[in-house]
Structures are given as C-alpha cells and as structure tokens.
C-alpha cells in the first residue's frame, strides 16, 4: 500500500513479520533482530531516501520498525542484500568480485569488491536505475528525470514501452486489447515470437546494455 507516501508500509511489514513468527512458533526471546532490505538509499542512520516506488522521500524505517517490534533492526538496500545473498549462496559463490543487476518493479544494481559491498559515499555506488540512457525521452521518470534506465528496463518500464508500441504499430499481436497488461504477459509473448513483444524487449535490452 503506497498511498499517503507509503506511510502504511511499515505497519504491514511489522504485521507480516509477527505472522511469520507465530507460524513458526518462535518466542520473542528467540528473535535476535530483524533485517530489512528496501529500494532506495538505505543510510547508515536507518533512514530510507528516494524510494520513489514506495512513496518514500525520507522514511525512518529502522526507528519505526524498532519501536513497533521492540527488536534490533538493520536496514539494507535491496540490490546490495541480493548481491550478498548471491555471493554467499548463489551465482557468486567462489568469487570475491561481482556485479549484480536486479530487474523488478524498478531497476537496481550492486557491486561486490573483495567480498564486500562497494557502497560509495551515499550507499548507492552500484545503483544504475536512474542513470540517463535516452536523452530524447519526453516522459518524466518517477524520480523527476528523463530517460532513466528504469523507464525501460523495469517491469513498469516494459509495460510502458509496450503500450506506446501498441499505439503506433499494426496491432497484429496477442497483446492487443489486453486491459491489465503485465510484464509476464509481454515476456511470454516474446518467447512465442510475438513481433511487438520482441520489439519491446529489444528496447529494454538496449537501455540495460547502455547502462552497463
């Protein structure tokens, strides 16, 4: 629920955590702390900034969850957390250096050097979602800029591009007259050789390739 600048998200997260705790029959004293990963800039102060997809300009996630759950809370950028997970138990096992790109509602990125996250001054050294790749874009990104990677290579971006192609091209595609278009539908259509879906995926690939 991202309404009202995402002010209900923390409560939903806390309720979900408590539900999982009850499901597993864990007592409070068995819970040492809580780790949360989130889009946006997760500062060392526990404040998440610039998580535009959640409606957060500056949300004190750590403080609010700590007060709500009465537990220690650690907040980490979602791409950094995913990269550490891959390094530990996934595709990065056995390596000390890696780059990871996450594609979902938005676009994230992380860099691991010598087994540690390259954070940079503000914790977002690996983030590529709001790099400008198409300077002639006329639609504004949620961040306020134009031509960001996320406008093309995210799930929302893929849907946006597909809708624009549906307006311009011969609508001989399985995607025509699809009221609730999803990224999965587009990708499935591309796998089946649908020309318009393939064109949309090509735009995604060019944007991501330019950023990398």
Show which residues each predicted segment covers.
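Glycine-rich phosphate-binding loop and adjoining helix at the ATP-binding site
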Residues: 3-18, 22, 29-34, 40-99
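Glycine-rich phosphate-binding loop of actin/hexokinase-like ATP-binding domains
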Residues: 93-152
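A mobile "lid/hinge" subdomain adjacent to the ATP/sugar-phosphate binding pocket shared
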Residues: 146, 150-212
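Active-site/binding-pocket entry motifs
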Residues: 40-42, 138, 164
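Short glycine-rich anion-binding loops that position phosphate/pyrophosphate groups of nucleotides
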Residues: 39-42, 104-106
């Amino acid at each position: 629920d991202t309404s009202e600048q995402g002010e209900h998200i923390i409560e939903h997260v806390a309720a979900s955590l408590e539900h999982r705790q009850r499901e597993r029959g864990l007592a409070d004293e068995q819970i040492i702390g809580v780790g949360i990963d989130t889009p946006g800039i997760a500062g060392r102060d526990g404040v998440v900034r610039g998580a535009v997809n959640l409606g957060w300009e500056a949300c004190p996630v750590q403080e609010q969850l700590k007060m709500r759950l009465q537990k220690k809370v650690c907040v980490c950028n979602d791409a950094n957390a995913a990269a550490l997970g891959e390094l530990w138990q996934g595709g990065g096992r056995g390596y000390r250096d890696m780059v990871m790109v996450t594609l979902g509602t938005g676009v994230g990125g992380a860099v691991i050097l010598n087994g540690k996250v390259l954070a940079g001054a503000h914790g977002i050294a690996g983030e590529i979602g709001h790099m400008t790749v198409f300077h002639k874009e006329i639609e504004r990104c949620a961040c306020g800029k134009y031509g960001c990677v996320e406008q093309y290579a995210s799930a929302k971006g893929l849907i946006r591009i597909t809708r624009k192609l549906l307006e311009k091209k011969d609508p001989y595609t399985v995607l025509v007259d699809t009221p609730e278009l999803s990224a999965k539908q587009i990708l499935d259509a591309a796998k089946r050789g649908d020309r318009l879906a393939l064109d949309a995926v090509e735009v995604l690939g060019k944007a991501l390739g330019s950023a990398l």
